[in-house]
Design a protein with these regions (language model features):
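Residue(s) in the substrate-gating loop at a strand-loop-helix junction
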Residues: 94
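The beta1-alpha1 cofactor-binding region of Rossmann-like NAD(H)/NADP(H)-dependent oxidoreductases
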Residues: 10-21, 56
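Substrate-binding pocket helix/loop in short-chain dehydrogenase/reductase
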Residues: 46-51, 55-60
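Active-site-adjacent segment of SDR/Rossmann-fold oxidoreductases
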Residues: 99, 120-131
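Active-site helix of classical SDR
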Residues: 74, 110
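A glycine-rich helix->loop->beta "capping" turn
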Residues: 3-6, 24-35, 43
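C-terminal tail/cap regions
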Residues: 151-152, 156-218
Length: 218
């Protein structure tokens, strides 16, 4: 209230909640110029550590929050943005959607899907005046980070403060960049993956083995 904002409890996995959020925001403030879709959820490959071991319930939860929440948001705001011939969709995804996250298959898979949807938005609606950006950090100091000091495999290139990620986002929006990479080395990893997929997979296997043989935080 102090900054003139509006806070609404919203379950982003429920489309009706997002529609209500958009309607209430536009009722109070007018048309939405920028919609930031930021919610995410991550689960580890448990209980047995295989890539398919995460429960069906957690797979579906990841799909609803990491993918469908972006779909629901776009569905709610696109008609108005297209009519006005302007608008910006900013989706928080993850470097896991460009590369992979060791030990979190449901997270990596749904983040790849989120990237694909954002690409479809940019391709389909760029000529409608709609801008799209995806934010793809590695480890960020939030409650989603695994419970050990170094952040695990995703903390290999350092753990960023939320404020640092925010600065990257502001710069990326100013440049209207589709891909916003707070950890700059992710771009290099993408190039290596694209240039030799098998070599990249072998490298990821070695990285996984090193973390299995070394206890977290050591």
């Amino acid at each position: 209230e102090e900054i003139g904002g509006l806070a609404l409890k919203t379950d982003v996995s429920v489309e009706a909640d997002i529609v209500r959020l958009v309607n209430e925001a536009e009722k109070q403030f007018g048309p939405i110029d920028v919609f930031c879709s930021n919610a995410g959820v991550a689960d580890q490959d448990e209980p047995d550590g295989t890539a398919a071991s995460c429960s069906n319930e957690n797979w579906l939860k990841a799909w609803q929050i990491n993918v469908m929440a972006h779909v629901y948001a776009a569905r709610a705001v696109l008609p108005g943005m297209i009519a006005r011939k302007q608008g910006y969709l900013l989706n928080t995804v993850s470097a896991a959607g460009l590369l992979n996250q060791i030990g979190a298959a449901s997270y990596s898979t749904t983040k790849h899907a989120a990237i694909g949807f954002a690409e479809a938005l940019a391709i389909t609606h760029g000529d409608d005046g709609i801008k799209v950006s995806v934010v793809c950090p590695q480890a960020v100091a939030t409650q989603m980070l695994p419970d050990f000091d170094d952040g695990g495999p995703q903390g290999l290139d350092g753990i960023l403060a939320p404020e640092d990620v925010a600065d990257s986002i502001v710069a990326g929006l100013a440049e209207e960049s589709f891909l916003i990479l707070p950890h700059e080395r992710v771009s290099l990893y993408m190039q290596r993956k694209a240039s030799d997929y098998d070599r990249w997979l072998n490298g990821m296997r070695r990285l996984r083995s090193s973390f299995i043989s070394t206890p977290p935080g050591k």
